[in-house]
Design a protein with these regions (language model features):
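Structural motif
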Residues: 9-10
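Conserved HGGG/HGGXW glycine-rich cap/lid loop of the alpha/beta-hydrolase fold
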Residues: 20-71
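Flexible "cap/lid" subdomain of the alpha/beta-hydrolase fold that forms the substrate-access gate
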Residues: 2-4, 13-15, 27, 40, ...
């Protein structure tokens, strides 16, 4: 049974949350990406809340800017330090400051927040699980040096346009459905994208798209252009990139926006790494292979840290 609630944070932001499991139990926190919402985690919330699967307190916030969470209009409000602050505050509330998260689980933009969180606040979580979300070190490397990644990420330069949210909303969100569909022209929509699931997406998108687009506007990690150096002007020290937590990475290899070159050399930044490459899965592996994602996470949670 999923409960929904509005969680005020001490610094004035409110996050709309979905949760399952008893408060006071070890906490799993799940972070979604763009253009999604917390609802994408419902099956995992219910699974891991069950006593036979760990009996966790499972919480999935809608990140700031999404669904009914606070959605500041200014781009600066979506800088990484603010996104990490939201999650650190939510962790303190959900764990009551008594113990670290059992695991922080994240996909896409949620993963970008989670990588930063794990680097800055390793004492607040025991483990990290990432699903098709590039580590900033490998992402920066590929954006600077790999023309294929620059082309794959070209959509980012569309999403930073001032009229991006207006264009995304046109024709019943035609472009957003395209993000979720199979990339081959003329191919049918994926089987997981049912009318019921579409209604869940619309319930998020109908509340506004500016917040989601502001994630892209606030980040320099995008392909360089003649008038905009973007990633080419960024250098990050190793101290900002190293993640010491035991980390699970699950990667659908058919991700057209985030190709598998992004997991090459990942162990240089994440020494305690468990990596699962999944053929025939895309960026939307949570929807395509929920059974596999659940099993990988279950095994990772049960494994002793090493």
């Amino acid at each position: 049974m999923i409960e929904t609630y509005q969680q005020p944070l001490p610094h004035g932001i409110t996050l709309s949350c979905r949760a399952a499991g008893e408060p006071g139990r070890p906490v799993l926190l799940f972070l979604h990406g763009f253009p999604e919402g917390a609802f994408v985690w419902d099956a995992l919330l219910e699974h891991f809340a069950q006593p036979q699967n760990g009996g966790y307190r499972c919480v999935a916030p809608n990140l700031r800017g999404f669904e009914q969470s606070s959605a500041p209009q200014e781009v600066a409000a979506y800088r990484p330090k603010h996104l990490v602050q939201d999650i650190a505050a939510l962790v303190a509330i959900e764990t009551r400051g008594a113990a670290p998260l059992a695991c922080l689980v994240a996909h896409d933009w949620g993963g970008a927040v989670a990588w930063n969180f794990a680097n800055q606040h390793p004492h607040l979580a025991r483990k990290l699980a990432i699903i098709n979300s590039p580590h900033p070190g490998t992402f920066l490397r590929e954006l600077k040096n790999n023309p294929a990644q620059q082309q794959a990420s070209a959509y980012m330069n569309f999403l930073i346009r001032e009229d991006a949210e207006t264009l995304l909303a046109e024709n019943d969100y035609q472009r957003l459905w395209g993000f979720l569909a199979n990339p081959t022209a003329g191919s049918p929509p994926p089987s997981w994208l049912t009318e019921a699931v579409k209604a869940q997406y619309r319930s998020v998108w109908d509340r506004g798209l500016r917040g989601g687009c502001n994630y892209y506007r606030s980040s320099p990690l995008r392909p360089p252009r003649p008038q905009d150096p973007a990633a080419a002007a960024v250098d990050l020290p190793l101290s900002m990139l190293t993640v010491s937590l035991p980390t699970l990475v699950v990667w659908g290899l058919n991700d057209t926006a985030l190709p598998p070159e992004l997991i090459q050399g990942l162990d240089a930044f994440v020494p305690n790494l468990t990596l699962h490459r999944v053929p025939d899965a895309t960026h939307w592996i949570i929807h395509e292979r929920p059974d596999l994602v659940t099993r990988f996470l279950q095994d990772f949670l049960q494994a002793a840290p090493h």
